């Protein structure tokens, strides 16, 4: 009897749990419908109807979004108390971040510095950072710390917005500002060829430094004349000015720059770094100008261990163009240790060894690279006839970890926006959350997005998390039926089609590029109309281009005829 009672109770519990789960799911569906209704009312500025809907959405993850829309619709007339209340409750959201940023600009314009300080959180905007510093300086809050923060913003070769001028004025009139700092910013500005910035800073120099600055500015404007009439004695600053002129001259008169270098390097004590900088720039200028002797200048750079991606990339590219394997081998020897471990440089080093008769050593490197799931790993595998390695290792996590991510407010908001087809809001909510998640949380989120069919977020988030071995997330076989049908119809390789889709749209079926290309395979409207005419019908609008089957079939057909 007891056993029967236990079975009945167990069965009832299962039924109850199933019914509860169904009711909760049904409740969420009803909430989405009510939220859509509220959005329509918000678009019509019917805020009374919005409030009525909101009363039914108290535990819905996006209920706050209706408050946000109401506030933004009448921002200038919204009380500070209402804004503060929203930020206190929903400040940790994409909308909260946007509202905070908008309010900070308004408060700065009104010079409401104490309220500005109250709501400020770290911002990327230099303007808002400068306003923050100004607010602290005016109110006397942590004055010295504020001045040092201003110094960090000020010390750059770039121009800064006028919003920074009040804070900079405090800096110029403080003990934090020194002649050494002024000279350093002039150096940074001249290095970037920002003459106007350097001249503006130079106005704050005492008279004894003005001549130094004037020499540099004159050299910048007319390097050839200045180099012909250079009279400064040998100091570090004089050598800086000379090198600036030589770099400027090399762009327009390469031979004259070389001649002046040969003259001045015998009379001035340039250090190793200055030698390196001169030859590095000369080499890059020679390549840009397409000079026939560019390989000579690339080889002349004293580049051992130099961390300069552009130089190394240019050297390898030129060596490959000229099939100069000996030069390529020498270039590899100059790489910093971390770059020598790069799959790309290792592969080309092995190719150079192979061409120079060192096949045994080359094979060792190719075999090592062939074990990797990487473009150069696959190229290496081809060299030694080894199979490609996919190395699919899905992100591992517990059920509890997965549930914690799924129930996190960041993810709940993004998911609801996604289900409502509000993709811009969904991506914004997702991006906000991913910036704040750890790498492991991001990797779990990527798998979650993949499970939902939100393929592009899965791809981008897995890459951000460094989950490179989670292959089915990074390379999903999405829209398989449509893509396979199109590939068969147009006699196009299926793998090639998937590669194009992933590269062009990351499986975003409604994506539109800056150039106007649409859909999975990024079809231009003009091309689509041409294809449509050839097939005997016209396109009323671009909506048909976004249809997955149409987009895939037409683009595959175009490539098939190429």
Label each region the model flagged.
Residues 1-9:
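Bacterial N-terminal signal peptides that target proteins for export
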Residues 70-72, 84-88, 100-105, 279-290, ...:
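Alpha-helical adaptor scaffolds
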